[in-house]
Amino acid sequence: MERGELVARLREEGTVLASLPGSGWGLFRTPAELVIARNVSEVEPAFRALEVWTGRGGYAAGFVSYEAAAAFDPCMETHVPEGFPLLAFAFYESPPEELALPDCGDGVFVSALQPEWSEEEYRERIAAVRAELFAGNIYQANLTFRCRAPLTVEPEALFLSLLSHHPVPFAAWVNFCGVKLLSLSPELFLESDGTRI
């Protein structure tokens, strides 16, 4: 598939491009249904719907945000960004179209990243995490913050370019529910083996 054709497909609402086991790629298009959880009480029913859909032989692709943690452990403190789903999955009738990615190494990058935290805020939050670790209240923490930058290219082209320059084993492009999510990860966070996630 040519780069232009792939970018056009990624623009379509309901599209998910994800790395498949091995070295291939799968492109999902035209979902039969979307399941979205915007608050903690909707997370468990969304997972039940996911289980029913895939149990009937359907396919699903989507994301679970870190902020969904409170649905599994009410003690987890999270800060949900306004308007961003805790969980969103698209349900598909057919398996993904398998494809090879075209060369997209054209050097499209984001410049002028502006962190949402000042250096002082960053140091304060690191100190707070360290204090919790030393007190034995936690054994690990995911401390992340957003950076913002003006986007001078289409997000689809940015994803393909980043992937060309930074290949990772687990990557995905998600385009539904008003979200265009670019994910390039060296690790797998969730995996199912029959009855267990």
Describe each PLM feature range.
Residues 1-197:
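Extended alpha-helical targeting/anchoring segments
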